[in-house]
Amino acid sequence: MKQLFATTSRGFEELLKVELTELGAQEAKVVQGGVHYQADDETLYRTLLWSRLASRILFPLIETKIYSDLDLYAAVSGFNWLGLFDERVTFFVDFNGTNQEIRHTQFGAMRVKDGIVDYFERQGKARPDVDKIQPDVRIHAYLNRENLVISLDLSGEALHLRGYREDAGQAPLRETLAAAIVLRSGWQVGSPLVDPMCGSGTLLIEAAQMEAKIAPQLYRLHWGFDFWKAHNQSAWEKVKNEAIELAEEKQREIQPHFYGFDLDHRVLKKAQKNAQNAGVSHLIKWQQGDVAALKNPRLNEVGTVICNPPYGERLGTTPALIALYSVFGQRLKKEFCGWNVSVFSSESTLLDCLRMRASRQFKAKNGPLDCVQKNYQVSERKSDEITAENELEFNRTSEVATDFANRLQKNIKKISKWAKQQGLDAYRLYDADLPEYNLAVDRYADYIVVQEYAAPKNIDENKARQRLLDAVTATLHVTGVETNKLILKVRQKQKGTNQYEKLANKGEYFYVNEYGAQLWVNLTDYLDTGLFLDHRLTRKMIGALAKGKDFLNLFAYTGSATVHAALGGAKSTTTVDMSNTYLNWAEQNLILNDIEGKQHKLIQADCLQWLEKCDRQFDLIFVDPPTFSNSKRMEDSWDVQRDHVKLMRNLKRVLSNNGTIVFSNNKRGFKMNLVALEELGLSAVEISHKTLPLDFERNKQIHNCWMIQHI
């Protein structure tokens, strides 16, 4: 009997023990990260060929304590490697673990390699070559404190590499993990299995191979024991031939009852190819389809729905995921009454959107992600009862979620009517009206943007996350917007250039209407959309004041105020901003509104430096500086409270005798230094109340606005 060790992912050790025991292993003992067991030659090969959960199967050679790299070298160089393989083979060393003496795994691997090749030289043999790509022999070393175990890796390549997956989707499951999910799902061999978001098909393929009695390594060509001198070829051939015969016999008995659905036809083609390589293509029916229209393919039977849907670190955006999980739960309760359901995800809060109570749950790792697998039993109820429940479901999230939905609905009724009368299709529907829901909801034509303000540090992260899920679910329901047209952003206090930080690179622009102006917006690539909605009335006022005047737009952002000034009949416009991105955006806004000519200048510059050097005058100036900035492209930091008087001194110099400055900023509690302005010869009148539109009247501190003129 040989002493062996099978490694596996953490959390799967007990499952692996059961599997190995069923394959004939003796004295199986669970430890963290694997299972020790004993096996004769046939059982050894059987576990290699048939284990669906083991990552590697190791044959320990050296177990000792080491206290230095010299001890490591001595232990390795003193072993009888010629009894294991000859000098003509290639080898590679996998080294795992460190201690105070062996601080780097590469150093540990090098010392093991040195010990092996030096042993062969001392025996008068040639030095065996190292091959990192496809070695004939793989040596596995594990160091835990002073405890060293060196083993022969009988697997060769890791056992999760079944050989059937030529291609995969964007976020494939490792095959060993997929097998564990199937085994934990409660699925019974012989019953239907449905994966509504199957991706490259790994879950279904693993299950189909289980039912078809196809050994997971049946098609493997290279093994870690191929050049092992103790390899028992006759025992291996017996075990492999038994597996081939069993697979051929079983395949004739099975009827297809595996079903894979996915929205992406391209990934379905990959799944079909993978199933063909795995020998189970005739057992699985593939169909392109949206989970929102999911139908039960086996109405008269009871089976299992198994799924690894997208989650935060995988694919999609959060609003789409919330909607996806919500509609998935609805379809399950409508179409799969009495069925078992097993869902694997890294987002426990997303699983809450299913609105189902789990009967069992298991923790697991998917790479670096902490994940959970939850099993559910769908109750047996009539479909009309389920439909009625789904209609009211969003109201059940919590009492506050109902309040949020009601408030949003009330605001929509009031604001949408007003916006239509004003000729607006970009406006705010909700702005942290309820303290429990600290977010803003904006409409941009057919799109909804939900901006989540950062939660205070004393608010539990999971609680805040759940409230956000509830709010997005309610927003989808109340507005009726399509899930791909709801954009979610997390807004935090901006520091320096963070306000201009790029979030994505989709490049998706469309225009909205504002008092006769058309303005480009981008809802995904930046934290801001290109249009400050709270300044809408300010821009309208600028348009009304601009006729026949030379207009300056300083800190211009995307130039929306310039558009209004030009449409209002400005004699000339000068638009200044430090960002090339936003200046190009401003240019496109001008083009969109047929505003062209040399009298409309766009200048990329540090606004403060440009202003100091400016030698012309303007009749109307709009300046909307940031609250704070420390951009590397600016010589000094900027603080609107600290520096606004200096700014006004420079603006006064370029302001014509009868000119007007419209000055605005977003600093809460901003105090205009009226005494200092008077000393400069300027008078300032606050007009904030006149520039707050209806959709922002609930937040009177969102900005402050001033009209400034020569005394």
Swiss-Prot record:
Query: Please, which domain of life does this record's source organism belong to?
Result: Bacteria
Q: Which reaction does it catalyse?
A: guanosine(2445) in 23S rRNA + S-adenosyl-L-methionine = N(2)-methylguanosine(2445) in 23S rRNA + S-adenosyl-L-homocysteine + H(+); guanosine(2069) in 23S rRNA + S-adenosyl-L-methionine = N(2)-methylguanosine(2069) in 23S rRNA + S-adenosyl-L-homocysteine + H(+)
UniProt keywords, alphabetically: Cytoplasm, Methyltransferase, RNA-binding, rRNA processing, S-adenosyl-L-methionine, Transferase
Per the UniProt entry, the Enzyme Commission number(s) are 2.1.1.173, 2.1.1.264
Location in the cell: Cytoplasm
Q: Where is the THUMP domain?
A: 43-154
* InterPro entries for this protein: 23SrRNA_methyltr_KL, DNA_methylase_N6_adenine_CS, RlmKL-like_Mtase, RlmKL-like_Mtase_CS, RlmL_1st, SAM-dep_methyl-trfase, SAM-dependent_MTases_sf, THUMP_dom
Keyword Chaperone listed? The answer is no
The record's GO molecular-function terms, alphabetically, read: 23S rRNA (guanine(2445)-N(2))-methyltransferase activity; RNA binding; rRNA (guanine-N7-)-methyltransferase activity
* Matching SUPFAM superfamilies: S-adenosyl-L-methionine-dependent methyltransferases
What is the uppermost EC class here? transferase
The record's section on SMART domains has: THUMP (SM00981)
Q: Which Pfam families match?
A: Methyltrans_SAM, RlmL_1st, THUMP, UPF0020
Under the cellular component aspect of Gene Ontology, which terms does the record hold? cytoplasm
Q: What does this protein do?
A: Specifically methylates the guanine in position 2445 (m2G2445) and the guanine in position 2069 (m7G2069) of 23S rRNA.
Q: Which family does it belong to?
A: Belongs to the methyltransferase superfamily. RlmKL family.
**NCBIfam families given in the database record:** PRK11783.1
- Its recorded name reads Ribosomal RNA large subunit methyltransferase K/L
Q: Which source organism?
A: Haemophilus influenzae (strain 86-028NP)
This protein's gene is called rlmL
